[in-house]
């Protein structure tokens, strides 16, 4: 991003906060292309959606695109030309525009973020970026709460809602009109042939989604701060998680007047909000009546302000002492551990019954077995079967694939309270690996293991234990507790990498 700023120093568009002229600069396309190549996700460039984009990209195509953008009528795809090469050419241009728009529109956000934290002693903690970093927080906080709202974030069904949401953050009217034009043209092409693959860049779609969610969170956090007796934590501390740019004066004029009666009913200083994977949870120590009021508030917020039809069935009220909470691949619930404490006062001794509340995070074994059965690792009952599609690979390749999957699952579910389900998953993968190798060599499992020996599966038994042995001291007592301890790793950034075994 510093390279972008260096070029924009000589461009008058930046001084006037105009982004639209940047679409007609050749160097912006080059920088965006280079910026995408340097940011890899799962060994693939984020800038590229498929391999053909790299082959088609050239300076000549960029110049043609800029000439077409000077005359937007040439970017419109007539219905009669949707099946011709002209439609495919324009679709490729829209793909380039979506990539460029995502890169350009991030420039004012990065500049604003840099100026907001300039001079402040804000420390970056990369451990907070891990998926496992939230579980210690939940173990500390949820044990004191009673209810959790599990809400599925609705998506806008109309494109104009996305444009209006982006209007609060992008002040350039020309860029918004151009964005609306390209978005509607893409949807017309998509509606004509629904089987076509999306041409919009994933980074561009992620930016639209984050803008939509940020608009909702800015309203919610403002109302939450107004309705609470305690002062909320400044959002600058969490700049790595949420880029929150609130419109406080606008909210104060509109929402305080409309929700003045409701704010008095939602006063609760003990409230925690966590967003993940298109959902969010709201943990509180309220009564069932107040939880239903929160549910009513969220339904009306989405329907009235965002004009999105939001069904109340998408808001689940879970009682932690009775219900399980599905969170980031875990099933979490509260467990009561009775404790008996012996107390002695002078010569009199007596027993005190005490109950300790603990948050248990277990493995959803049924859903994982269903996923393994879908990928042909086992049947629906959990019995291992051979992976027929992998028999054409070499023995080392087959073994490495199974070992990678087994280690990734063990790595992610290392914080489970019940290790038996994890051992069952490992057993399925180990036996599936043996059956796959035996099928390749046209032999039985017993004869194959007898011929190669037990050293074949040593790769499954090592790896995770070596990591744990570096964390805990090497003693007999520690080795006995090695398979029962719960470990949360702070290096898991992407959940899709854990299941990427191809």
UniProtKB/Swiss-Prot annotation:
MF term (GO), any: RNA binding
Q: Would I find DNA damage among this entry's keywords?
A: no
Its GO CC terms?
chloroplast
Gene Ontology biological process terms from the UniProt entry: mRNA processing; RNA splicing; tRNA processing
- Identify the domain of life: Eukaryota
**What are the alphabetically sorted keywords of the record?**
Chloroplast, mRNA processing, Plastid, RNA-binding, tRNA processing
* Entry's localization field: Plastid, Chloroplast
A single Pfam family it belongs to is MatK_N
Where is it predominantly found? plastid
Record-stated family: Belongs to the intron maturase 2 family. MatK subfamily.
**Described function:** Usually encoded in the trnK tRNA gene intron. Probably assists in splicing its own and other chloroplast group II introns.
What is the recorded name of this protein? Maturase K
Q: Which organism is it from?
A: Brassica oleracea
């Amino acid at each position: 991003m510093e390279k972008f700023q260096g070029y924009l120093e000589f461009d008058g568009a930046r001084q006037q906060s105009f982004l639209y002229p940047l679409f007609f600069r050749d160097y912006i396309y080059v920088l965006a292309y280079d910026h995408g190549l340097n940011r890899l996700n799962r060994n693939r460039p984020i800038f590229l959606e498929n391999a053909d984009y790299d082959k088609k990209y050239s300076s000549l195509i960029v110049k043609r695109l800029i000439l077409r953008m000077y005359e937007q009528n040439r970017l419109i795809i007539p219905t009669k030309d949707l099946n011709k090469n002209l439609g495919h050419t324009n679709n490729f241009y829209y793909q380039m525009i979506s990539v460029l728009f995502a890169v350009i529109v991030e420039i004012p956000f990065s500049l604003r973020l840099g100026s907001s934290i300039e001079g402040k002693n804000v420390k970056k903690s990369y451990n907070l970026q891990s998926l496992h970093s939230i579980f210690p927080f939940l173990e500390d906080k949820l044990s004191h709460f009673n209810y959790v709202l599990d809400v599925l974030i609705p998506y806008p069904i109309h494109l104009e809602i996305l444009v209006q949401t982006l209007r609060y953050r992008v002040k350039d009217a020309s860029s918004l009109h151009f964005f609306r034009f390209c978005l509607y043209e893409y949807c017309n092409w998509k509606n004509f042939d629904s089987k076509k693959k999306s041409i919009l860049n994933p980074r561009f779609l992620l930016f639209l989604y984050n803008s939509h969610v940020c608009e909702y969170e800015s309203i919610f956090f403002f109302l939450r701060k107004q309705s609470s007796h305690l002062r909320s934590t400044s959002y600058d501390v969490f700049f790595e998680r949420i880029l929150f740019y609130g419109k406080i004066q606008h909210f104060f004029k509109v929402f305080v007047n409309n929700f003045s009666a409701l704010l008095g009913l939602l006063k609760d200083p003990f409230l925690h909000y966590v967003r993940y994977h298109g959902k969010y949870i709201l943990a509180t120590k309220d009564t069932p009546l107040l939880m239903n009021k929160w549910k009513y508030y969220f339904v009306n917020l989405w329907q009235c302000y965002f004009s999105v039809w939001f069904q109340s069935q998408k808001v689940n009220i879970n009682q932690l002492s009775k219900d399980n909470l599905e969170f980031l691949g875990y099933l979490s619930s509260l467990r009561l551990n009775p404790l008996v404490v012996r107390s002695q006062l002078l010569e009199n001794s007596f027993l005190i019954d005490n109950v300790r509340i603990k948050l248990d995070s277990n493995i959803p074994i049924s859903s994982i077995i269903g996923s393994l059965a879908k990928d042909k690792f086992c049947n629906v009952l959990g019995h291992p079967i051979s992976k027929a599609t992998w028999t054409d690979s070499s023995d080392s390749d087959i073994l490495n694939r199974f070992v990678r999957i087994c280690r990734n699952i063990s790595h992610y579910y290392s914080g489970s309270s019940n290790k038996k389900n994890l051992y069952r998953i490992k057993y399925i993968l180990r036996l599936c690996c043996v059956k796959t190798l035996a099928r390749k060599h046209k032999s039985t499992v017993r004869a194959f293991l007898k011929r190669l020996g037990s050293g074949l599966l040593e790769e499954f038994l090592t790896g995770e234990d070596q990591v744990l042995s570096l964390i805990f001291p090497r003693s007999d007592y520690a080795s006995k507790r090695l398979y029962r301890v719960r470990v949360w790793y702070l290096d898991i950034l992407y959940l899709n990498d854990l299941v990427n075994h191809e």
